[in-house]
């Protein structure tokens, strides 16, 4: 099997923010056991910023971009040093792979990442992946590493995604504040994964919470990948999750896997704007998988160019689809509501072609 395992900042750092070597030792022991059993394992590890904070003498996590990026560069080196030392103790070679949003927005980079990671696995290495925070040109957090791990699971055609955290899994309420909260052990593939109310906040040392993990599970499910959310400190948690032993919360893989191109449009591409459509267009798109025509467009929000990815919403503001537009925002505003016969010469007859349009799952 091919496994993507993500461990969060709060699970591999101490309260002071330093790297918790024991946590990495436990994780790598599971990785080594899986490797001995013939499985490929990719680790997605948070913790660079948290590990860098005490190293540079700061009292707490900074909030400004420049300091966050600088601290990330310091912390990433320390984090990877620990991984390399521990993996070498098992006769394994760690390989640092840093990714940024461009690697999931640009199709060429997306495929290049797949080839590089695939080759590392062929060579017997254990890729340790993190977001390339130190040189991010926009927001430091591209979603979060939960989403990154889910996109990698799709990219690598993984069999299972394991999200390791400081909770036992998904609960009916936040167990840290509600004593009546109970563990949800399984979520079916046809269950709207994001409909369950969760606390979106993570720990003070990380950027992800349960809401981001549910979003990641949704991406993975529609990639045909089983997902498990479980407590990182549980003995043998990664091995048990891969084996299918009852641990944490399991999200079943959907039996209808979205093609790579459509999954990329739905979950990975940067959104440049929004197109609001009338009820007739929504019904045609949702039930008959038709293209979106200018006649069905009610309004255009944002500034985007031909080829950009946009949200498609109904008149109630509900986003139900995403797609790659065949014209710029300025051109589309000039043809809102027009029938094909009324379009100016040279104007595309399809705002979004059906092959570039994805009705969002759930």
How does the language model describe each region?
Residues 1-61, 65-93, 97-362:
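C-terminal catalytic "cap/lid" subdomain
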């Amino acid at each position: 099997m091919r496994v993507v395992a993500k461990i969060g900042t709060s699970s591999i750092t101490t309260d002071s923010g330093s790297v918790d070597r024991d946590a990495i030792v436990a994780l790598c022991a599971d990785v080594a056991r899986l490797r001995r059993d013939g499985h490929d394992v990719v680790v997605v590890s948070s913790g660079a910023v948290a590990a860098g904070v005490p190293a540079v003498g700061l009292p707490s996590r900074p909030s400004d971009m420049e300091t966050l990026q600088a601290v990330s560069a310091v912390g990433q080196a320390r984090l990877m040093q620990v991984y390399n030392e521990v993996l070498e103790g098992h006769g394994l070679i760690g390989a640092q792979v840093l990714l940024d949003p461009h690697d999931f927005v640009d199709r060429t980079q997306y495929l290049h990442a797949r080839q590089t990671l695939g080759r590392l696995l062929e060579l017997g290495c254990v890729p340790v992946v993190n977001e390339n925070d130190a040189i991010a040109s926009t927001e430091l957090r591209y979603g979060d590493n939960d989403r990154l791990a889910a996109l990698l699971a799709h990219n690598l055609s993984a069999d299972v995604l394991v999200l390791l955290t400081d909770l036992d899994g998904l609960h009916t309420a936040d167990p840290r504040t509600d004593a009546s909260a109970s563990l949800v052990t399984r979520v079916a593939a046809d269950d709207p994964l994001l409909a369950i109310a969760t606390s979106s906040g993570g720990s003070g040392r990380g950027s992800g919470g349960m809401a981001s993990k549910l979003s990641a599970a949704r991406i993975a499910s529609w990639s045909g990948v089983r997902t498990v959310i479980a407590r990182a400190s549980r003995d043998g948690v990664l091995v048990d999750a891969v084996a299918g032993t009852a641990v944490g919360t399991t999200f079943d893989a959907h039996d209808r896997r979205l093609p790579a191109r459509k999954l990329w449009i739905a979950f990975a591409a940067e959104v440049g704007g929004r197109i609001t459509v009338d009820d007739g267009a929504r019904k045609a798109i949702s039930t008959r998988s038709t293209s979106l025509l200018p006649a069905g467009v009610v309004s255009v929000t944002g500034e985007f160019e031909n080829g950009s990815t946009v949200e498609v919403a109904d008149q109630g503001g509900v986003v139900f689809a995403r797609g790659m537009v065949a014209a710029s925002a300025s051109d589309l505003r000039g043809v809102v509501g027009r029938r094909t016969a009324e379009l100016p010469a040279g104007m595309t007859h399809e705002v979004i072609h059906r092959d570039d349009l994805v009705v969002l799952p759930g």
